[in-house]
């Protein structure tokens, strides 16, 4: 029996759902014998992206789905995150000024900066009223 190279999960826009995503990434990493550092990096990247969507993406209190797909091919993990929140292109967010003392830095943007620094490639598009963020990360142990 072969191990799935693609796995998806539908999350609700609640912070507690991030635990389900973390578990999925860990199981996927184990199944494909990915390096622990790579699995941790992917979990941090997804944590930053998904928490940002949950915290800032919606104008109403309704439940929304956030779809996350992982696909491994030739040692490269493709990650797709899709949501129906407000249009938001994380590539348009300027990086934080890390030279300023932390108490003088404006609030926001650090999580996106972290995610962008972890991903080897990041692309955004708006499609049929949905944000679609696609990222690629080279796996050292794949």
Predicted regions and their residues:
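Glycine-rich/acidic phosphate-handling loop/turn and adjacent ATP-lid/helix
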Residues: 79-107
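Flexible, glycine-/charge-rich segments associated with ATP-binding catalytic modules
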Residues: 1-10, 116-142
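Short helix-loop "hinge" at the ATP-lid/N-box region of the Bergerat-fold HATPase_c
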Residues: 53-58
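Short beta-strand-loop-beta element adjacent to the nucleotide/active-site pocket used for signaling
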Residues: 71-79
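A conserved short beta-strand within the histidine kinase catalytic ATPase domain
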Residues: 64-71
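Conserved polar catalytic motif of the HATPase_c/GHKL fold
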Residues: 48, 52
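Glycine-rich phosphate-binding loop
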Residues: 104-119
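Conserved short strand/loop->alpha-helix "switch" segment adjacent to the catalytic nucleotide/phosphoryl-transfer site
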Residues: 23-47, 104-106
């Amino acid at each position: 029996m072969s191990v799935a190279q693609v796995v998806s999960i539908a999350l609700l826009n609640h912070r507690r759902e991030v635990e389900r995503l973390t578990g999925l990434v860990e199981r996927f990493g184990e199944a494909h014998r990915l390096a622990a550092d790579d699995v941790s990096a992917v979990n941090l990247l997804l944590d930053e992206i998904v928490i940002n969507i949950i915290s800032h993406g919606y104008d109403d209190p309704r439940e929304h789905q956030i779809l996350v797909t992982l696909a491994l091919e030739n040692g490269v993990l493709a990650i797709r995150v899709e949501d129906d929140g407000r249009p938001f292109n994380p590539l348009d967010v300027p990086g934080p000024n890390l030279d300023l003392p932390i108490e003088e830095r404006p609030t926001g943007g650090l999580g996106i900066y972290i995610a962008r620094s972890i991903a080897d490639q990041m692309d955004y598009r708006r499609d049929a009223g949905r944000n679609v963020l696609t990222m690629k990360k080279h796996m050292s142990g794949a």
